[in-house]
Amino acid sequence: MSDQRAQEMIDLGNKLFAKKEPLNSLHQEIALQFYPVRATFTMSGDYLGRDHADHLNDSYPVLVRRELGNSISSTLRPRDQKWFLATSLDEDRDQDPDNARYLEYVSQTIRTAMYDVRAKFVRATKEGDHDFITFGQCVLSVEESPDRQHLYYRAHHLRDCAWLENNIGDVDHIHRKDRMSARTMKRSFKESALHQSVKDACKNDPGQEFNVRCVMMPSDEYDYTGPDAKTKGRKAPFIMCYVDADNGKMLAEIPSPDFIFVVPRWQTLPGLQYAVSPATSVALPDGRLAQTMALMIMEAGEKAIDPPTAADGDVFKEFNLQAGAMTWADLQGDRKISDVFQTIPINADMRTAFAMRADLREMLAKAFFIDKLNLPQVGPDMTATEVRARLEEHVRQLLPLFEPMEHEYNARLLDKTFFRLRAMNRFRTDIMPDTLSGADIAWGFRNPLQEASTRILVQQFREAIEVETGAANMGVGVMRTDLGIARDDAVRGIGVPAKWRRSNEDMEAEGQAKAKAAAIAKAAQEASAVAGIAQQAGDAAQSMRMGGLLPAPSKPGVEDEMTELPDEPEYVDFEDVAA
């Protein structure tokens, strides 16, 4: 039964790859013009050591594609910054300091795992970035290492992958071609699953390679008919099959809790599971023209520097114009060299050619969004409104470029990474706040695009302060803006770490303590003022007695001394006053 399933997987994959052949031809042409080292879609045989750019006359199309490909990592995944942050998709819940600290802990754990040198995340995403820019899509996988000590990221050649979408437009069924040596197959699969030819190769030629198909699909699609329908992989949503395509033998059937492949797609078209690159799709004619124009300019330059010549064949038997060379001429009579040899003047207008090339390169730069990558220049004389307008325009221009990359590319990579790390028990659940229990984890991003949006938020906060201050100076009622909330939004917007922020309870306790201290100080000030008034009154009465304006007080008798005891002193409890 397993061999029958193996043949079914091979036949299904063959159909998918046959339908994909025209796309491979297009990708080959695109790669020849913009990504020569990747121009292996229709090649067969050993291409190692080949000069991939021997057909090019102008390197500019390759350079602009390379610049855009490199900008993905530097813009969306800067290594020196925390470019992503876990979120629960609930702003009120995320604002809680305890929740924010745990989400920051999750983000740091993922970042540590991704940038582990053994995970090869940077290498895989660098390959994927250039495929994504050039061909509009790429294929990566997020796997556990065999010892389950770290993750392992891989990028796969688009030529070797074919996939299908489900009914909601997600890729959940993929066929991948691979070549494994007999030695690797023996180490990776059971001895009983290997074909006899593989076993013989292990003894005689361990380096002999065999064609292997890696097929991953939902479990409910795998063998959905027959007596064993939906029995394999029922405990897991997906199943991975390894098939010996040369011998039609099933090597392994491995249930999987998730779909390990990530297939980011830049611009999709209705009814197609494959995407296109909006950059190379419009730049391909200009790329071809750039090569033709470069050849034309080189020929014109050669003619201008080393123009063609004309000579009398009867005079010159053998013509040699090399430096220091001698040419024998049979001159008869009074004939001169200038009479039998002359240079054909070529008046090439190179300025026109250079202007045409500059215009072509400008179009290529626009096709690859090079003119929109840098932040707008802000002058010292610009007003806040002008700065804000430029930043908003910059964000609008970059959205078509980077928005699909964040959602289709980075977010899906983070989802797979989070799922794998959770399966490896890399997250501490004992410190998770109860309010985050059962919450879905999503991702927010920090990059120049988000930085531009953050600058807009901070600018709005500053403008609000200016408006409220001006209104207060003019005596216009109560302040409309809640500056506390606005300040908190601005602080979160500029990316202040969660561990810097104080909890609401701490801030409330400090506020109460400050209010109590202020009340005590006020009560003490009032008591001091009362004592001062009493002292002034006593001094005034004494002065009036000395001046004869008031009679001197009579001396009390013994009985008065016994009966007229001094009043008990009055004590002021400042805490009661403050309360």
Each language-model region and where it sits:
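C-terminal anchoring/interaction modules
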Residues: 1-26, 34-35, 39, 308-579
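Flexible, active-site-adjacent loop/turn segments at secondary-structure boundaries
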Residues: 119, 133, 137, 149-159, ...
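Extended, helix-rich architectural segments
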Residues: 1-205, 579
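Charged, low-complexity, helix/coiled-coil-prone segments
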Residues: 3-11, 38-55, 66-79, 96-101, ...
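Long, contiguous amphipathic alpha-helices that act as assembly "spine/axial" helices in icosahedral shell
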Residues: 95-144, 274-309, 345-378, 387-421
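Generic hydrophobic, helix-prone segments enriched in Leu/Val/Ile
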Residues: 67-75, 123-132, 212, 284-288, ...
